[in-house]
Amino acid sequence: MLIRNVIERITGENRLRELALMVAQSCGDAIWTRVEGGIETMSTPEARGYVRGRAGIIVRRQVSTAAQHNDVKPSRHSRLLELTMQSVIDGMIQ
């Protein structure tokens, strides 16, 4: 039983990561229009915070929709949000 739980946890995390990447890609253009003029002169930590702040509403809405359409358990919504936000930030700061 323990091995089964570990496998389910690993595959569930992988599924969340894939979904987070898809959600991040789907809202990337909308977020880029909000941050494109401001992050060039910022330090990396400052730019990460700026992107996080400007992307918040868009990402939360997209994650909520994706979670409903993909039957993500409510207990995993916050993890999906965290993974998606990280993907968005990484994509904008590269």
Give the residues covered by each predicted segment.
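Protein-protein interaction and targeting regions used for scaffolding, dimerization, and localization
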Residues: 2-94
